[in-house]
Amino acid sequence: MSRKAFVKGANPYMPLWEHVPDGEPRVFTYNGETRVYVYGSHDTERTEYCGKDYVAWSAPVTDLTDWHCHGICYQAADGSILYAPDVVQKGDTWYMYAADCKGSRIMVARSETPWGPFTDPVQTELGFDPGVLVDDDGRVYAYWGFCKSYCAELNEDMATIKAGTLRENPIPHCRAQWSPDDGCEGRECFFEASSPRKIFGKYVYIYSRRVNHHVPELGVYEDCNGFLSYMWSDRPLDGWQWGGDISFNGGEILTDAEGMGTMTFRWGNNHGSVTEVNGQWYVFYHRQTGRDEYSRQAMLEPIDAAQGKDGKVWLGRIVYRDGKPIASCPVEMTSQGPQVNGINAREWISAGYACHLHGGKETAWIEPVYEQRDDISAPVKNITDGTAVGFRYLQFGLQTPKTVTLMMKADGAGKVSVRLDTPGGKEIAKFDVKDGETTVPVQGGIIGKHAVYFVFGMKNGTAEMDRFTFDD
């Protein structure tokens, strides 16, 4: 194996061995250093959602590829499984809203540092998936709910609800077999994952919506809660107006001539939020790996943020006319994440960074890994005839590479076609399917930033893709 660096800080932005879904990004300054902190669940149980601890991760605002784990920051006193948390700062204290006992008991714990440990938990009056906003005037608002949403102002104790402020169902909830039977059929469709923010002086309620109708342009033809959506208001507890969708974890959307879309990555539940870092806004969300929803991973993408003349907050991929926002849609799901110029094509790139897994006679998946090594790779397994494994995007620089090296395992025979920009794009290399590390020449000039796809033509059997790299 060539001795070269392994890609890190792409998408997922944490190491491939880490599994932190439901990430709430927060920008905090401590001892003069400003960092982005992410607080989420921790998929360590492997056979069910989440785990029995929270870990805190952070990165300097100057480099969102350089993430550091501060270790365990909270565990429930009774050792119960913890669902999605949130953390806010008020004064010199950081407050963690911890979802003990699978989210049925919301505790607030305190710390004198943003990375914890968070201690002395007190039970609150909040419910499932709590999100908290400390307003500019110091007043504190909380948002929560599963299927049905709630919000309220909190008392000074940061735990109890201020009398007369509780709002029930501020956002119409989705229809589902486990939800109340008064669910809406409109676009709002609240599901879970409440996350409040203040943007451009407006209140923004970010949440996971469960779509109960077809969205053909995104390849949605069944009930689907892979969206992070938002509403906005002039007030913190009511008056919510539809904003749009920020993120969708169904991968690249392939669109046919009739405008009908096809997802290329297995969607699943979604949870996250947005934050501004050095003038650029980002959405933090999660993806699914493995064959279930118990090994989710933290993802991020840069997004547009703007305000219309009517005061509306626009988030996501925004369409402008004459310099004014007129429409928006979810940002694309990528392999590059914070590496906005593309992943270095000359480093080892794990197959686990794929954002496109589509086609094939059977379903391929990214195999979860847990060993804490810098050179760990998460392979794509169960590759069959027609499977395309795609990466958006790689950076080739100003010089065309001479070779591409692929590491894989196989129990069958076939060919691998390496294609540029689309799964059916220009072929730049071709491999025989076989065990081990194989190097072949690159055909044609390649410079700059491109999507790269490995399209498998299997005569028989299956293959497993581990990693690849380009060389001069």
Go through each PLM region and give its residues.
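Carbohydrate-active catalytic/glycan-binding domains of CAZyme proteins
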Residues: 1-472
